[in-house]
């Protein structure tokens, strides 16, 4: 797998925003293409997010390279996390209600022989100028952070836990005070961690979470796969959970990536690792029933490494998947076209779509 960090932005339509009153023929921009905007080193870029109301501002997190920020659409980048005690990043999240609030979860969340761990959660209240360590120090691997879109102090964190041994600080955690205190709200056992989270776009009490039970030591490959993996739903803000099973594989479950269509929140998509049943799954009834829409290896291959799936903000049939190439579907996940990279290519791990301007897509490798 490549060690270079690629970070690409599709910025079709930005000139239209600059000339708001001028009528411009959209055909002029059909020739726009992806371009490499850096930074150039650091490892896998595992997290990428922008600020919807500030389309020139992006943040990325690198598995061994800390957190970086650009304020000029990616032309220049500045490291903003170098003074912290870890450089291993698992995820980051910018609060929609207050873009000065940024959360970082440290520790790349994978099961593989070679990775670096972190030391918990961090928060910045000044857009990355300064940071405060929040806790979850023994988590070691944090893969997903959700911030309530209306309350920047209410967050959910998916903790995978120790990569090479059992520990109890794993599962889904909730905080109502900006990470000053955490409460464990979904937990299976000391061998099973949380890997994925998704939130209903208008009802922040509806949350989806995926648990993953697996382990491999530095000298092994796929040494342990437990029975605790699964997909769960809470309708009361994380107080109680029910497992979603109907239509999903019941044997060999591994990593699951979950996403909600912002414009049609009963539409869910999942990238599911399950041996011969690995593939892209869809639900049209908020997770009650699932069906497989695609099982092509180019879309869902190596599912324990690649598990990033996102939906267009206004069209629930347009879906993006990050894999060795970034793929796009226009028909609800049935068929896919590579839009960046090539089979056997670049290893993409992060996607972000600006909800206010979906022509802006961050694609991180």
Predicted regions, residues:
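Positively charged n-region of N-terminal signal peptides that target proteins for export
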Residues: 1-5
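Beta-propeller blade termini and top-face loops
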Residues: 21-365
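Bacterial N-terminal signal peptides
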Residues: 8-18
């Amino acid at each position: 797998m490549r060690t270079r960090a690629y970070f690409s932005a599709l910025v079709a339509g930005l000139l239209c925003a600059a000339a708001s009153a001028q009528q411009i023929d959209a055909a002029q921009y059909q020739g726009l293409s992806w371009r490499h905007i850096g930074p150039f080193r650091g490892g896998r870029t595992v997290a990428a997010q922008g600020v919807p109301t500030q389309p020139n501002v992006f943040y990325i997190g690198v598995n061994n390279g800390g957190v970086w920020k650009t304020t000029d659409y990616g032309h220049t980048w500045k490291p903003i996390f170098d003074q912290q005690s870890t450089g291993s990043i698992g995820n980051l999240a910018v609060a929609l209600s207050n873009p000065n609030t940024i959360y970082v979860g440290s520790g790349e969340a994978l099961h593989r022989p070679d990775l670096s761990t972190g030391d918990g959660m961090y928060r910045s209240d000044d857009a990355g100028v300064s940071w405060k360590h929040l806790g979850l120090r023994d988590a070691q691997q944090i893969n997903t952070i959700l911030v309530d879109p209306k309350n920047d102090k209410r967050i959910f964190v998916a903790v995978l836990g120790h990569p090479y041994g059992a520990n109890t600080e794993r599962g889904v955690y909730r905080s109502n005070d900006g990470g000053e205190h955490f409460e464990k709200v979904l937990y299976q056992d000391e061998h099973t961690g949380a890997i994925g989270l998704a939130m209903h776009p208008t009802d922040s009490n509806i949350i989806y979470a995926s648990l993953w039970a697996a382990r491999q030591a530095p000298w092994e490959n796929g040494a342990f796969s437990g029975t605790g993996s699964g997909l769960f739903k809470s309708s009361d803000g994380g107080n109680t959970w029910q497992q979603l099973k109907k239509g999903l594989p019941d044997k060999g479950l591994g990593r699951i990536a979950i996403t909600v269509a912002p414009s049609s929140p009963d539409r869910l998509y999942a990238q599911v690792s399950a041996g011969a049943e690995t593939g892209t799954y869809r639900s049209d009834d908020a997770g009650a029933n699932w069906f497989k829409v695609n099982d092509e290896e180019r879309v869902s291959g190596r599912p324990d490494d690649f598990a990033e799936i996102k939906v267009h903000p206004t069209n629930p049939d347009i879906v993006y998947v990050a894999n060795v190439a970034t793929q796009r579907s226009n028909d609800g996940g049935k068929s896919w076209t590579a839009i960046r990279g090539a089979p056997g290519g670049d290893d993409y791990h992060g996607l972000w779509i600006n909800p206010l301007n979906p022509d802006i897509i961050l694609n991180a490798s």
